[in-house]
Swiss-Prot record:
<dbReference type="InterPro" id="IPR029001">
    <property type="entry name" value="ITPase-like_fam"/>
</dbReference>
<feature type="site" description="Important for substrate specificity">
    <location>
        <position position="163"/>
    </location>
</feature>
<comment type="function">
    <text>Nucleoside triphosphate pyrophosphatase that hydrolyzes dTTP and UTP. May have a dual role in cell division arrest and in preventing the incorporation of modified nucleotides into cellular nucleic acids.</text>
</comment>
<keyword id="KW-0546">Nucleotide metabolism</keyword>
<dbReference type="GO" id="GO:0036221">
    <property type="term" value="F:UTP diphosphatase activity"/>
</dbReference>
<feature type="site" description="Important for substrate specificity">
    <location>
        <position position="80"/>
    </location>
</feature>
<comment type="similarity">
    <text>Belongs to the Maf family. YhdE subfamily.</text>
</comment>
<dbReference type="GO" id="GO:0009117">
    <property type="term" value="P:nucleotide metabolic process"/>
</dbReference>
<keyword id="KW-0963">Cytoplasm</keyword>
<dbReference type="GO" id="GO:0005737">
    <property type="term" value="C:cytoplasm"/>
</dbReference>
<keyword id="KW-0378">Hydrolase</keyword>
<feature type="active site" description="Proton acceptor">
    <location>
        <position position="79"/>
    </location>
</feature>
<dbReference type="InterPro" id="IPR003697">
    <property type="entry name" value="Maf-like"/>
</dbReference>
<protein>
    <recommendedName>
        <fullName>dTTP/UTP pyrophosphatase</fullName>
        <ecNumber>3.6.1.9</ecNumber>
    </recommendedName>
</protein>
<feature type="site" description="Important for substrate specificity">
    <location>
        <position position="15"/>
    </location>
</feature>
<dbReference type="Pfam" id="PF02545">
    <property type="entry name" value="Maf"/>
</dbReference>
<dbReference type="GO" id="GO:0036218">
    <property type="term" value="F:dTTP diphosphatase activity"/>
</dbReference>
Amino acid sequence: MSGRPKLVLASGSPRRLSLLNQAGIEPDALRPVDIDETPTKGELPRACANRLARAKADAALRALQIDDELRGSFILAADTVVAVGRRILPKADLVDEASQCLRLLSGRNHRVYTAVCLVTPKENFRQRLVETRVRFKRLSEEDIQAYIGSGEWRGKAGGYAIQGIAGSFVVKLVGSYTNVVGLPLNESIALLGGEEFPIRAGWLDAG
């Protein structure tokens, strides 16, 4: 490749894009992929996040191999899993799913895992998994019903968005906050920088 290498974010998540922008990085393209995100039987949360991030990266790479403009780009993919013990919570799309998640999380500790997978222009894969521990306050029925009414939970792992109203539910957080939002910035930028992507190129324009 000549000139600045290109970066493709293999996600349609506004949160992941916003986090990259926060770090001064503007992807050249967004290429969300459609894969089956159902955990396999007995799959552990860590393994699930790692498998799905790799599957998203693989799918994006296949798509870009036939794209003359973006072939040879860096590809960044990620998957976030919320778990209570070994139980993986869904990415809630239905009210019943979100209600069940919130009742399970109420007053308890849970863990958020995000796996980040980077594909280099030479089609090498680099991957990191980040874990954050979160504890929610005990949620009242009024809390749950009002939060369901907000709609903020739709499509979110574990049925909540920490960067929104649900941030007020958090009693304690140990680890990376951006990991819970959907993309651990420190580790993601380290992956890119380790493969000589110009991570600081946009900093002069960040102000």
